[in-house]
Amino acid sequence: MSSTENLETQHVERMRHTLSHVMAAALTEMYPGIEFGVGPAIKDGFYYDVDLSKVKGSDGEAVKISDADLPKIEKKMRGIIARGFEMQYSEKDRDTTLAWAKENGQEYKVELIEELPEGEVISFYQLGDFTDLCKGPHVGSAKEIGAFKLMRVAGAYWRGDEKKAMLTRIYGVAFETEEELKTYLNRLEEARARDHRKLGKELD
């Protein structure tokens, strides 16, 4: 891999990581009381694990997010990007960070912070009104966000432990250009069509 290709790879990974924060910011606006687990960049995209058990609907029941909700979440994300933002970096000590997580009702963040050693300095990134503890790295601003699409909702145990809470995981994909995104989505569609034809033959 050339140095230019390496820089491009690093940039798209940072962009995907930033998009997980954009999604979290959108979810915070849409679902007050939502709790967050972790939201990394992954191959081709990003995800964030969330807990909606304290977010109540008009019927008094906990709100659930399904694939049908993804277009409106994506729309909110695009609105945040259109408003413009710069990722603001800051550092806080462990006790201040712990107090912040407790004050904001972020129990999963509390668990992560409590495992850190005393005296640990913790990095934060702020995107508009949304703040999250995070090691980074991220892109600098909304202008560096490329093409993205939210793909699906799944369940995921907190920290991969089936004895812990089942969280809602929201997946997205992201690329530098709309053309790359379109190519990726077309490949997925072709793979699904092949699988469907294969299944049809097996059932004949």
What is each of the regions a protein language model found here?
Residues V12-M30, A41:
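Active/ligand-binding-proximal structured segments within catalytic/core domains
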